């Protein structure tokens, strides 16, 4: 990995998650994986976003605004970073294990390819059984994504997309490029343009 490029951890914790925030920060600092650690809180929203979230959460509590803060804060950090810097987003409930340094470096090496700007993780069948202890259900995109959203992006009948294992938004790596900026803007914009595509209303 290019030593001139920063590795930045991004997370968000609402005001009722202070215990988790402290644990997460401690693990992140102890791991020494990151050049910067940015854990955002409710008072880090700008006025526009704060008003939007307040409006949503009056009636719909899921995900503190249906997780709109994920693309919001990741995009914010990318825009403030240099091209080539890597953001690792992780939910505040994730655990950062310092002993996994080799695996972490493997992820960074994948992103060292100039053609790779996103490293997400999928619920693949390979992960159904872990040490014969944990069993995971099949989680395909079509089971958990609204059909109206598929239709909006013109992929409702594309089985190569809708029948694949769903990508997990709880942790991912994203490198600052023009493509990643466009991707994050698209993710954020859909909340403002068509909120009905991401909420729990019927599709």
Spans of features found by a protein language model:
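Glycosyltransferase catalytic domains, chiefly GT-A lineage
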Residues: 1-203
């Amino acid at each position: 990995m290019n030593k001139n490029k920063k590795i930045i951890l991004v997370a968000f914790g609402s005001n009722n998650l202070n215990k988790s925030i402290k644990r997460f920060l401690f693990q992140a600092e102890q791991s020494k994986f990151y050049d910067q650690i940015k854990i955002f809180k409710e008072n880090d929203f700008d006025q526009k976003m704060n008003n939007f979230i307040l409006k949503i959460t009056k009636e719909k509590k899921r995900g503190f605004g249906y997780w709109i803060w994920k693309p919001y804060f990741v995009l914010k950090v990318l825009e403030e970073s240099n091209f080539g810097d890597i953001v690792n987003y992780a939910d505040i409930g994730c655990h950062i294990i310092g002993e996994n340094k080799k695996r972490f470096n493997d992820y960074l090496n994948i992103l060292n390819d100039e053609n790779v700007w996103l490293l997400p993780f999928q619920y693949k069948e390979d992960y159904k059984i872990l040490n014969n202890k944990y069993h995971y259900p099949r989680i395909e995109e079509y089971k958990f994504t609204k059909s109206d959203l598929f239709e909006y992006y013109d992929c409702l009948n594309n089985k190569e997309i809708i029948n694949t294992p769903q990508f997990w938004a709880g942790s991912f790596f994203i490198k600052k490029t023009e493509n990643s900026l466009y991707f994050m803007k698209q993710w954020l914009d859909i909340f403002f343009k068509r909120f009905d595509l991401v909420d729990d209303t019927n599709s």
